[in-house]
Amino acid sequence: MKKINFILLFLLALSISTFAQKRTNEGLDTRDLYSDTWVATDAIGRTMPTNAETGDIKDDKRRVVGIFYITWHTQNIHSWKSPYAADVTKILAQDPEARKDTNHKLWQNDAYHYHYAEPEMGYFLSQDEWVIRKDISMLTDAGVDVLIMDVTNAVHYWDEWEVIFQTMQKVKAEGNPVPKFCFWAYNGPVITVVQELFNRIYKENKYSDLWFYWDEKPLLLYNSDPHHNASGGWVENPNPNYYEAAATDPNDPHYNNPDYTQKSLTDYTNEVKEFFTLRNMWWGYYEWAGKQYIGTEDNWSFGYSLADDRILNMSPEELLSTHNGKREQAAVTPAQHPVTMTENPMGVGKSWTRRFGEPQLNEYDMPEVGYIPYLNQVKENPVLYGAYFQESWDYALKGDPEFLYINDWNEWTAMKFNLPPNSPWLGRYNSFMFVDQYNMEFNRGIQPMKGGYGDNYYMQMAQNIRRYKGSRPIPQHLGYAECKIDGRFGDWKHNTIEYRDTHGDTFHRDAKGYAGLHYTNTSGRNDIITSKVAVGKDDISFYVETVEKFTPHTDPNWMLLLIDADNNSSTGWYGYDFIINKSIKSDRLTTLMQYDSEKGEWCHAADIAMRYADNHLELSISREALNLTGDSFTFDFKWTDNPAGLDNPISLCLDGDTAPNRRFNYRMIWRKE
């Protein structure tokens, strides 16, 4: 979304009995992955809160999380000039002086949209099904319920929506949970835009299994007063429903119905008003269209203008939008903008805090040092820590609304605007500016980036959504369960505790990207869906199941099992102390290897029994070898197949399959009785 703003003189327009029940609100065919019981430690040491911190699933009221989902990376962008070099972070890394000169050679003359940094999945386009599947998986794992589709600038992305919604239906048909969707329209001929959405999707009952309902009707976020918007005021709204017979033929079914007789519309049609639950949504200014906006009835915000002291001094409860006097909606953003719409020319970035504002920027327009309130520490490279994001979450959690809106997931690009010489921007005089995002500090993105802050903001979002919604207790294994490693797998039928993973995440990639780029990924191989663990008197046994028959064990990086035996993320290889199947001796014998931190390598620890047949695999490890010999213990584990390498946890995120997804782990808790 591009929010067009005025700057300077410019108009820049959930107790578990058998841990295998389904969530009733997801439907009988949806397979519960229990992602709210997964554990993780992110790149800066923050951990996923468990039931001990969050409490049980909170059922005191509706608790819904929506996220702004961008689809403007359209297919035509593939034809842009190659090679693609419109990446602000890479431009400034080459020559930081480019930040001062709009005519610098590194600013491509034919590029008006720039990435602030490279996405983890490359410079993708919105019809890339591989990316869409990754997005849906990440968002549902984190607890996101609804995608807010962007129509804020009066552009319909019909082709992109078609691919996205069809992909969501495929993922749903595979038994996975998926979010719902709704639309947000605001600027331009918004009445026409909304009518076209209604006519082509809702009236045609397209993708109705994916519609998001609020107060028993599909939700539409819109502009309740089309005479006031961010693109300059009223524009004509042609009526898509108009036809002459409705005005002239008494026998016509719509005779004298103003929804059909007006060539231009000055208000939304009755069918739109009756069909949807409507909520006005725009930026959280203190005043908008001549009256107070923030904290008022039915006026949702997609962020708060914290550069305005009137808003900065409001309590969490005062920031909330209400409906019939009840706290309804709050916004959470990772940052704001490189511009503030105030007399202060400094932006509000990811390291901005209520106490200290934006840290001093270096020659790359990045903060080198900043205060992190939730740590009560000053940190180097503060952008890694999400100071603004956490303050935003803290306020929203205290306000405790029914709907949390997060802005945004995947916008990535922004327009570069030329300015007159000596125009104030980012605390200096400059000849150009970016409004919505600029670099790694000044952006509102959460989707993981390549390098930089990586998936820190995604993990931070998942941590806080769990605090908002609560979570289920991690199931506990009681007593001994002996399993014979014989390739028959019958012992496992009585083990009711399942650790589950997404079905279909070995999908292969073959898609166009920005400016001639083409992305392929055929690493998806063994699609892991279920695993189990059993503790015997002397051994711990593991079982794993895939969708289809296993590929041969001689394949590279085949069905690796990683174990954090000491439950300490700071030891071993990113917390993992042992790995199984890194070296396989035969189809019945594999190895247990232990990580040697001093050598920085995996070393042989023991040979262990393994059997696999069709889509089932089992193996057994001595408890003594894992240092798990007591009457109770806890350890974390994950399966991964065909990662490109074992460089860091992100190595497990993009290639092959990992169960559970990304850097999440399953937690196994056992006691003797």
Per-segment meaning from a language model:
Residues 21-74, 209-211, 227-240, 252, ...:
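N-terminal module-boundary/linker segments of secreted carbohydrate-active enzymes
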Residues 38-42, 113-128, 144-155, 179-191, ...:
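The substrate-binding groove and active-site-proximal loops of carbohydrate-active enzymes
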Residues 48-163, 407-408, 412-446:
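N-terminal carbohydrate-binding/catalytic regions of secreted carbohydrate-active enzymes
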Residues 52, 58-78, 223-386, 396-397, ...:
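Aromatic-lined glycan-binding groove of carbohydrate-active enzymes
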Residues 60-66, 142-147, 174-181, 207-209, ...:
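Loop/turn elements at helix/coil->beta-strand transitions in domains of secreted/extracellular proteins
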Residues 170-171, 418-489:
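Aromatic-rich peripheral "rim/lid" segments of glycoside hydrolase catalytic domains that contact
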Residues 475-486, 493, 562-587, 623-673:
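Acidic/polar low-complexity flexible segments
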Residues 487, 538-548, 617-623:
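Short, well-ordered beta-strand segments enriched in hydrophobic/aromatic residues
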